[in-house]
Structures are given as C-alpha cells and as structure tokens.
C-alpha cells in the first residue's frame, strides 16, 4: 500500500490462464504453478512483477514463500516432531539427489519442460535464516497494519534436535 500508493481490494478467484486479468480486476497475483506458467507464457500487453524481487527492493529482506507449521500439541511430542522433521529433511535430500527422476515423474502432470522445472528448482531457497525470520515477521506486521489480518500471529519456533 505504502510502496505503490494503492488502495487494493483482494478477492480469491479461479484464473483463466489465457485471460489472466478478469474484466472485474485491474491486476492478478499468481502463485505456484500459475505464476510459473505465466512467467514462461507472457502476454505482451501485461506488466509482470516478481513478488520476491519487489519484496527485496521494498524491505531489503528475502521473501518467505512457505514454512513448515505444527500445532502446539505436536511440539510436546519431541520424538514425533523429530521423526517428521527427519522425514522432511530426508525427502529434500532424496529429491535433490534424484532431481532428474523427480522431474520426469511429474512431467505428464504439468505444463512445463524438464528444463523449466530444473531451472525453477535452482532458484528456490530452502533455508530459514535469521533474515528469513525477520522477513516473515515484517510480512505479518505489514499485513496487520494494512488490515489484511485481524491480529498479529504469535510465532514460536521449536528447535528439533
């Protein structure tokens, strides 16, 4: 809001990828496969902004796109939490070690080439550093200050050993 001097209304809709901006909207925020598809199939009359790059310019911080979340009860069972954490970490390792096989396994389910998927995986950042934590808290602060969320979430980080 402050950065672009805009007062936006947000609405969740299904997007027609051949007509990204509906007649009722002035802009569309795409995430996930829709964003990647749009990146590789740009429509000439539209402007495209990488939300992560814009966030970095505006805040100086990295964008946090996803986090692993557990409820308060899960943190009490350290053994189960460690088991789940280890499985996730091993899954990432297996995926990276077998990247080409993993890519081939989804090619018939997505609208991307193996090269596009491989390039996408190279630019993802899988770390969660102190800067990422700061960025996530800044995101929530701005969302709250702009009336997008009713209250600031209390975020608690659990160490998994």
Q: Which residue ranges define each predicted feature?
A:
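Residue-level detector of short coil/turn "hinge" positions at structural boundaries
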Residues: 8, 114, 150-151
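Secondary-structure end/capping motifs
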Residues: 76-142
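Long, low-complexity C-terminal extensions of enzymes
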Residues: 144-161
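A basic- and aromatic-enriched beta-loop-alpha substructure that forms the phosphate/nucleotide-
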Residues: 1-8
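General small-molecule cofactor/ligand-binding pocket signal
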Residues: 9-13, 155-158
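Pocket-lining segment of extracytoplasmic ligand-binding domains
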Residues: 13-105
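Flexible, active-site-adjacent loop/turn segments at secondary-structure boundaries
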Residues: 49, 53, 66-68, 119, ...
């Amino acid at each position: 809001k402050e950065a672009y001097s805009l007062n936006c209304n947000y609405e969740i809709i299904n997007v027609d990828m051949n007509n990204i901006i509906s007649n009722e909207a002035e802009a569309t925020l795409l995430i996930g496969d829709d964003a990647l598809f749009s990146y590789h199939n740009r429509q000439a009359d539209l402007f495209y902004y990488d939300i992560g790059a814009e966030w970095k310019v505006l805040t100086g911080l990295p964008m946090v796109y996803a986090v692993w979340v557990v409820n308060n009860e899960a943190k009490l069972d350290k053994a189960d939490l460690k088991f789940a954490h280890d499985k996730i970490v091993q899954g990432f390792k297996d995926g990276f070690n077998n990247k080409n096989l993993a890519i081939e396994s989804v090619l018939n389910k997505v609208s991307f080439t193996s090269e596009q998927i491989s390039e996408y995986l190279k630019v993802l950042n899988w770390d969660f550093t102190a800067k990422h934590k700061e960025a996530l808290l800044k995101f929530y602060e701005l969302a709250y200050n702009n009336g997008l969320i009713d209250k600031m979430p209390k975020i608690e980080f659990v160490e998994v050993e």
